UniProtKB/Swiss-Prot annotation:
Keywords: Acetylation, Amyotrophic lateral sclerosis, ATP-binding, Coiled coil, Cytoplasm, Cytoskeleton, Disease variant, Epilepsy, Hereditary spastic paraplegia, Hydrolase, Isomerase, Microtubule, Motor protein, Neurodegeneration, Nucleotide-binding, Phosphoprotein
UniProt-recorded name of the protein: Kinesin heavy chain isoform 5A
Quaternary assembly: Oligomer composed of two heavy chains and two light chains. Interacts with GRIP1. Interacts with FMR1 (via C-terminus); this interaction is increased in a mGluR-dependent manner. Interacts with ZFYVE27. Interacts with VAPA, VAPB, SURF4, RAB11A (GDP-bound form), RAB11B (GDP-bound form) and RTN3 in a ZFYVE27-dependent manner. Interacts with BORCS5. Interacts with BICD2. Interacts with DTNB.
Organism: Homo sapiens
InterPro entries for the chain: Kinesin-like_fam (IPR027640), Kinesin_motor_CS (IPR019821), Kinesin_motor_dom (IPR001752), Kinesin_motor_dom_sf (IPR036961), P-loop_NTPase (IPR027417)
Region (Disordered): 906-939, 978-1010
SMART domains in alphabetical order: KISc (SM00129)
Residues bearing the modification Phosphothreonine: 397
Disease implicated: Spastic paraplegia 10, autosomal dominant: A form of spastic paraplegia, a neurodegenerative disorder characterized by a slow, gradual, progressive weakness and spasticity of the lower limbs. Rate of progression and the severity of symptoms are quite variable. Initial symptoms may include difficulty with balance, weakness and stiffness in the legs, muscle spasms, and dragging the toes when walking. In some forms of the disorder, bladder symptoms (such as incontinence) may appear, or the weakness and stiffness may spread to other parts of the body.
Length: 1032
C-alpha cells in the first residue's frame, strides 16, 4: 500500500568534464560560460538547471550536492532513480561508478553503497533490513543479466500494482558495502565495452543497478520498502566521429534507437497534453516507467563535453535536460499497513459510511416530501454542507429536473409511477454496473491478450533456448563430473603435499630444538670457562700473596740466622737467576723477530698498494683506449652504412641505365625495321633514295653516339662500384681488426679486473694479518712489561735478601764462635731455607708461565665466545626464517583452501541456481554476521573439516615454535592427544571430523548448527574453536 503522496519535479544536474588530451592537441576551445551554481551559457544562450558543476568539481562534491539525500529518501520508503545521460565520452560512467576502490575518485554508486549502511547502523535497533541487489544491462535491445551471463534475453513484466520489473533477474542479498562492491565488480567485468575514436572504454549497453531495501519495525510490525535505480546510459554516438563499423556500428544503432525512445517519452511527459506515452517503444523506458512520471524521486545527470568540436551534441544534451526538468513525478511512501492499522482504517471508513447513509436517508425523506407536493420549511431542510455531501454521494443517481413540479394524481397511480420509477432506476443502475464491468473486462482481456502475446513470444524463445541448452547442459553435466573428480584429486594431492610440509616443519622444529640444546651447552661451557678463569686468577693472586708471606718469613728467619751464624758466605741460586735471564732473553728475541715480520708485512702492504694504484692507472688507460676504439668502430660502422646506401643507390642507377639501354635497343630495332621498310619504299621511289641515305646515316651516327655514351657511363659506373666494393672490403677488414682488438682489450680488461680483485683480496688478508700482528705486538708488549716488573721485583728482593743474609753472617762471625755444635744445625737450616727459596722461585716461574699461557688462551676464548654469539644469532635468524616460512606456508595453504571453497561454492550455487534465496537481515547498530571472506554465510562441510584440520596442525606447530605466546593463538582448548583415525585416503583424514556434540564448526562462521560433512563410525575429534564476534 502507498500513501503520503508528494508531487515533485525531476531534479536535473549538469556536469562538464575537462578537456581531454585529444581535444587539447586538436586545439578545441572551451565553450561553456558558468553563471552561478545553476546556469551555463553555450553559444550565447543560457541554460538553467538545479545545479551546474564545472570541470574542477570533485566526486565527493557531486555526491554531497545531489545524491546523498536520495539515500535518506529510499530508507524512508520512497523509490529513487539516478540517471546519467549524455553523448559518448562525456563522463557518465565516471560520474556513476568512477574508480570503485579509490576513496577520492569513486563515483555515486560505491558512495551510495557505503552511505546506505552508515545510515542503517545509526538508526533504531528495532528495525530489521533486507537488502538485495541486481545488476543487468540492455544490450542490442535485449536484457542481459550481468551476474549470470547465461541469462541473455530476459523479459519485462508487471506486478500486482502494475509496476514493471525484469523477470528472472538474479538477486543477491547483501549485508555490507564490500559485498555490494564485489557484486559491482562482478557485473562490471561482464559488461560490454569497446574502443572508439572518442573513448577507449566506451560502454556499449545501458546498465541498471537496482538496490531493493525492505525494512520492518520489530515492535510495531510496520513495513517499508524502497527501490533505488542507478542507471548508467550508453552515450549517443555520431558515426562520423566515433568511426564505428561492423558490430560496433550495430551497437551504436541500437543505442541511438533506445535513446531516441527515451527522448520521445520525455517529450510526451513534458508536453503534458498527450494521453499516450510511448513507454513500450524500448525495454529501457519500459523498465524505467515508474521513474519517469510515476511513483519515484528522480535525479538526472546530464554529462556534457566542453569542447567546441562537440558543440551540437552539447546543445542537444542541454535541451534534453531542460525538457526533462518539467516532468512531474508523484512520489509516495511504500507502506504496508499492519492488521491493527487496517482495523482502525476500517472503523473510520465504517463511521464515515454510517454518517453518509444517515445523510442519504434524510435527503431521500426530504425529496419524497417534495415529490408528494409538500412544502418543506427551511428549518427542516438539511444544511448546505450536508446537502453538498449528499449530492456527492448520490451524484450517480440522476434526478429528474421536473420532479419538483407538483402534480395532483391519485395515490394508486402515484404508487404505480413510483414503483415504475424505482424499477427503471434500478435497471439503469444495473446497466451502468454492467457497462462498467464489461469495460473493465474488455480492458482486462486486452491486457491479458497483450500479456499472452508477450508470454507466447517469450515462451517460444524460452522453448528454443531450452532445446538448445539441453544438450549444452548435458555436456556441462559431464564436464562438471570431470571437474569434481579433478577437484577431489587436487584435494588429495593437496593433502599429500600438506603431510610432506608438516613432516618438513617437524624436522625443522627438531633441528631448531637440537640447535637450541647445542646453544645451551655452549653457553654453559662458556660460563664454566669464565668461572674457571676467575678461579685461576684468584688462585694466582692467592699464590702471589703466599709467596710474599713466605719471602717475608724467610727474610725474618735469615735475619735471625745471621745474628746467630756470623759472616759465612751464602751460596746464591745462580742457576735460577740464569734461567730467568735466559727466558727473558728468549722473549726479547721473539719480540724482535715479530717486529721484523711486522716490518716486512708493512713493506709488502705498501708494495701491494703501489701495485694496486698502478693497476688502477693501467685500467683507466685501457678503459680510455677501449672507449676510443668503440667510438672508432661506431664511426666505421656509420661509414659502412653510408657506403652501403650509396652502393644501393648506384645499383639502382645502374638498373635504370640498363632499362634505358634496353629501351634504346628496342628503339634501334624499331628504327632498323623502319629502315628496312624505307629501303623497300626507296626501291619504288628512287628519286628519294639520296635523302633516305642521308637520314639513315644521321640516325646511325646518332645511335652510335648514344651507344658510346652508354658504354662509357656503364664503364664509369662499374669502376665506381669496384672502388666502392674495395673500400667496403677494406672497411670490413678494418672493422674486423678493430673488433678483434676490442675483444682483446676486453679480455685484458677482464684479466686486469680479476687480478685487481685477487690483489685486493690479498691486501685485505694482509691487512687482517697486520692488524693481528699489531694486536699480538701490543699483547706481547704488555706481557713484557709485566714480566720485567715481576723480575725486577724478584731481583730486588733477592738483593735485599743476600745483603741481609751477608750482614747477619758477618755479625754472627764476629760473635763468639764457641758454640761449634750449633753451627752444623744452623748450616742445615740455611740449606733448608735455600731449598725453600729455590722451590719458591720455581713456583713463581711456573705461575708466570701459567699467566702467560692464560693470556695466550684468553684471545682464543674470546674468539670462541664471539663465534658462539654469532652462532646464537645465526640460530635465532634461522628460527625466525623457519617461523616466517611456516607462516607463508600457512597463508599459501589458506589461499588454496579459500580457492577450493570458492570452487565448491560455485558448483553448489550452480546446482541450486533456481532455488530460493535466504535473506540476511541487517540490524541497525550491528555489523553484518558474514565477513568478506564468507560472503554467502555458508560453508560446505568438506571445506569446514579440511580447514579446521589445517588450522589445528598450524596451531600445534605454533605451540612448538613459541610455547610462551599463548594469547595469540587461533584456537583454544586444543586437544592434541586426539588423532584422525578415519579411512578413505589422505583426504578423508581431513574431511571426517566431529565434536562432542557431533557438529563441525567453521572458523569463519558464527553459527553452530552446520551439519558434519562425512559420517563415519569412528570420526576424528574436532577441536573446539572460538566463536567470532559480530564486529569481526
Amino acid at each position: 500500500m502507498a500513501e503520503t503522496n508528494n508531487e515533485c519535479s525531476i531534479k536535473v544536474l549538469c556536469r562538464f568534464r575537462p578537456l581531454n588530451q585529444a581535444e587539447i592537441l586538436r586545439g578545441d576551445k572551451f565553450i561553456p560560460i558558468f553563471q552561478g551554481d545553476d546556469s551555463v551559457v553555450i553559444g550565447g544562450k543560457p541554460y538553467v538547471f538545479d545545479r551546474v558543476f564545472p570541470p574542477n568539481t570533485t566526486q565527493e562534491q557531486v555526491y554531497h550536492a545531489c545524491a546523498m539525500q536520495i539515500v535518506k529518501d529510499v530508507l524512508a520508503g520512497y523509490n529513487g532513480t539516478i540517471f546519467a545521460y549524455g553523448q559518448t565520452s562525456s563522463g557518465k560512467t565516471h560520474t556513476m561508478e568512477g574508480k570503485l576502490h579509490d576513496p577520492q575518485l569513486m563515483g555515486i554508486i560505491p558512495r551510495i553503497a557505503r552511505d546506505i549502511f552508515n545510515h542503517i547502523y545509526s538508526m533504531d535497533e528495532n528495525l530489521e533490513f533486507h537488502i538485495k541487489v541486481s545488476y543487468f544491462e540492455i544490450y542490442l535491445d535485449k536484457i542481459r543479466d550481468l551476474l549470470d551471463v547465461t541469462k541473455t534475453n530476459l523479459s519485462v513484466h508487471e506486478d500486482k500494482n502494475r509496476v514493471p520489473f525484469v523477470k528472472g533477474c538474479t538477486e543477491r542479498f547483501v549485508s555490507s558495502p564490500e559485498e555490494i562492491l564485489d557484486v559491482i565488480d562482478e557485473g562490471k567485468s561482464n559488461r560490454h565495452v569497446a574502443v572508439t575514436n572518442m573513448n577507449e572504454h566506451s560502454s556499449r549497453s545501458h546498465s541498471i543497478f537496482l538496490i531493493n531495501i525492505k525494512q520492518e519495525n520489530m515492535e510495531t510490525e510496520q513495513k517499508l520498502s524502497g527501490k533505488l535505480y542507478l542507471v548508467d546510459l550508453a552515450g549517443s554516438e555520431k558515426v562520423s566521429k566515433t568511426g564505428a563499423e561492423g558490430a560496433v556500428l550495430d551497437e551504436a544503432k541500437n543505442i541511438n534507437k533506445s535513446l531516441s525512445a527515451l527522448g520521445n517519452v520525455i517529450s510526451a511527459l513534458a508536453e503534458g497534453t498527450k494521453s499516450y506515452v510511448p513507454y513500450r517503444d524500448s525495454k529501457m523506458t519500459r523498465i524505467l516507467q515508474d521513474s519517469l512520471g510515476g511513483n519515484c524521486r528522480t535525479t538526472m545527470f546530464i554529462c556534457c563535453s566542453p569542447s567546441s568540436y562537440n558543440d551540437a551534441e552539447t546543445k542537444s544534451t542541454l535541451m534534453f535536460g531542460q525538457r526533462a526538468k518539467t516532468i512531474k513525478n508523484t512520489a509516495s511512501v511504500n507502506l504496508e499497513l499492519t492488521a491493527e492499522q487496517w482495523k482502525k482504517k476500517y472503523e473510520k471508513e465504517k463511521e464515515k459510511t454510517k454518517a453518509q447513509k444517515e445523510t442519504i436517508a434524510k435527503l431521500e425523506a426530504e425529496l419524497s416530501r417534495w415529490r408528494n407536493g409538500e412544502n418543506v420549511p427551511e428549518t427542516e431542510r438539511l444544511a448546505g454542507e450536508e446537502a453538498a455531501l449528499g449530492a456527492e454521494l448520490c451524484e450517480e443517481t440522476p434526478v429528474n429536473d421536473n420532479s419538483s413540479i407538483v402534480v395532483r394524481i391519485a395515490p394508486e397511480e402515484r404508487q404505480k409511477y413510483e414503483e415504475e420509477i424505482r424499477r427503471l432506476y434500478k435497471q439503469l443502475d444495473d446497466k451502468d454496473d454492467e457497462i462498467n464491468q464489461q469495460s473493465q473486462l474488455i480492458e482486462k482481456l486486452k491486457q491479458q491478450m497483450l500479456d499472452q502475446e508477450e508470454l507466447l513470444v517469450s515462451t517460444r524463445g524460452d522453448n528454443e533456448k531450452v532445446q538448445r541448452e539441453l544438450s549444452h547442459l548435458q555436456s556441462e553435466n559431464d564436464a562438471a563430473k570431470d571437474e569434481v573428480k579433478e577437484v577431489l584429486q587436487a584435494l588429495e594431492e593437496l593433502a599429500v603435499n600438506y603431510d610432506q610440509k608438516s613432516q618438513e616443519v617437524e624436522e625443522k622444529s627438531q633441528q631448531n630444538q637440537l640447535l637450541v640444546d647445542e646453544l645451551s651447552q655452549k653457553v654453559a661451557t662458556m660460563l664454566s670457562l669464565e668461572s674457571e678463569l676467575q678461579r685461576l686468577q684468584e688462585v694466582s693472586g692467592h699464590q702471589r700473596k703466599r709467596i710474599a708471606e713466605v719471602l717475608n718469613g724467610l727474610m725474618k728467619d735469615l735475619s735471625e740466622f745471621s745474628v746467630i751464624v756470623g759472616n759465612g758466605e751464602i751460596k746464591l741460586p745462580v742457576e735460577i737467576s740464569g734461567a730467568i735471564e735466559e727466558e727473558f732473553t728468549v722473549a726479547r728475541l721473539y719480540i724482535s723477530k715479530i717486529k721484523s715480520e711486522v716490518k716486512s708485512v708493512v713493506k709488502r702492504c705498501r708494495q701491494l698498494e703501489n701495485l694496486q694504484v698502478e693497476c688502477h692507472r693501467k685500467m683507466e688507460v685501457t678503459g680510455r683506449e677501449l672507449s676510443s676504439c668503440q667510438l672508432l668502430i661506431s664511426q666505421h660502422e656509420a661509414k659502412i652504412r653510408s657506403l652501403t646506401e650509396y652502393m644501393q643507390s648506384v645499383e639502382l642507377k645502374k638498373r635504370h641505365l640498363e632499362e634505358s639501354y634496353d629501351s634504346l635497343s628496342d628503339e634501334l630495332a624499331k628504327l632498323q625495321a623502319q629502315e628496312t621498310v624505307h629501303e623497300v619504299a626507296l626501291k619504288d621511289k628512287e628519286p628519294d633514295t639520296q635523302d633516305a641515305d642521308e637520314v639513315k646515316k644521321a640516325l646511325e651516327l646518332q645511335m652510335e653516339s648514344h651507344r658510346e655514351a652508354h658504354h662509357r657511363q656503364l664503364a664509369r659506373l662499374r669502376d665506381e662500384i669496384n672502388e666502392k666494393q674495395k673500400t667496403i672490403d677494406e672497411l670490413k677488414d678494418l672493422n674486423q681488426k678493430l673488433q678483434l682488438e676490442l675483444e682483446k682489450l676486453q679480455a685484458d680488461y677482464e684479466k686486469l679486473k680479476s687480478e685487481e680483485h685477487e690483489k685486493s683480496t690479498k691486501l685485505q688478508e694482509l691487512t687482517f694479518l697486520y692488524e693481528r700482528h699489531e694486536q699480538s705486538k701490543q699483547d706481547l708488549k704488555g706481557l713484557e712489561e709485566t714480566v720485567a716488573r715481576e723480575l725486577q721485583t724478584l731481583h730486588n728482593l733477592r738483593k735485599l735478601f743476600v745483603q741481609d743474609v751477608t750482614t747477619r753472617v758477618k755479625k754472627s762471625a764476629e760473635m763468639e764462635p764457641e758454640d761449634s755444635g750449633g753451627i752444623h744445625s744452623q748450616k742445615q737450616k740455611i740449606s733448608f731455607l735455600e731449598n725453600n727459596l729455590e722451590q719458591l722461585t720455581k713456583v713463581h716461574k711456573q705461575l708466570v708461565r701459567d699467566n702467560a699461557d692464560l693470556r695466550c688462551e684468553l684471545p682464543k676464548l674470546e674468539k670462541r665466545l664471539r663465534a658462539t654469539a654469532e652462532r646464537v644469532k645465526a640460530l635465532e635468524g634461522a628460527l625466525k626464517e623457519a617461523k616466517e616460512g611456516a607462516m607463508k606456508d600457512k597463508r599459501r595453504y589458506q589461499q588454496e583452501v579459500d580457492r577450493i571453497k570458492e570452487a565448491v561454492r560455485y558448483k553448489s550455487s550452480g546446482k541450486r541456481g533456481h532455488s530460493a534465496q535466504i535473506a540476511k537481515p541487517v540490524r541497525p547498530g550491528h555489523y553484518p554476521a558474514s565477513s568478506p571472506t564468507n560472503p554467502y554465510g555458508t560453508r560446505s562441510p568438506e571445506c569446514i573439516s579440511y580447514t579446521n584440520s589445517l588450522f589445528q596442525n598450524y596451531q600445534n606447530l605454533y605451540l612448538q615454535a613459541t610455547p610462551s605466546s599463548t594469547s595469540d593463538m587461533y584456537f583454544a582448548n586444543s586437544c592434541t592427544s586426539s588423532g584422525a583415525t578415519s579411512s578413505g585416503g589422505p583426504l578423508a583424514s581431513y574431511q571426517k571430523a566431529n565434536m562432542d556434540n557431533g557438529n563441525a564448526t567453521d572458523i569463519n562462521d558464527n553459527r553452530s548448527d552446520l551439519p558434519c560433512g562425512y559420517e563415519a563410525e569412528d570420526q576424528a575429534k574436532l577441536f573446539p574453536l572460538h566463536q567470532e564476534t559480530a564486529a569481526s
